[in-house]
């Protein structure tokens, strides 16, 4: 089963890469871009037996750094996650 | 002083670290490969060197923090063994949960490689006892991800408990409150982005970093019940 894990920076965490990309888009003449934030998409292929709680544990322990990042899990069309993940 | 330098695939400051320890203490450290699940017994000091462990995959230090050897480093740190993480070593210690906060991409995007002035904010720690409180020292930085961030409550706590060991005198990489190095709650774990091991002999231009290792040697010698003279 395919599971997509989206890892994004928490609100308020400065994203220098996003800022640089934003500047580059403006340099290319694109108007109307208000902000750019860079995140990661991690695709997992897991057995059906792997519980949601276990995937969340994978995110907390390794895939995301809960100090600065949130994660969102998309599993067979469902979306779950912790957009307001607790700071460590 | 019985010491060890942990080596990960992609570490590149491990030998500089070993040489700095040898120069300051007179005894070369043991080099410990990351796959080892046990550290050598009787260690007085563990260093986690700089570099690009695991090619900085996922996040700087994230993969190294999960290596077998880090479980032993964690338990040694919990027993009070001094642990120093420099640059990638600092990143690894935060990823391993031994130090709070995170090191993000430098605010100006660029890799920064130059000498920087640091203020010694706490000269009472086992790592900083050879510096005067408030002294300005010069130590080089070489990093892309040294932008220290933590939530305000954590930053306040670090400041209030004297756990900010070093601060950049001038803004360097966007770090919150210009923090360059922090201590854990027990004071036996220090993480810092600047490289003290690159400033240990006159040929380096200055030797400001050497006093960090010498201070540590003092602390270890006292703990082991030897006089400083007997060791040096």
Map each language-model feature to its residues.
Chain A
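Long, contiguous binding/interaction regions
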Residues: 2-41, 47, 54-88
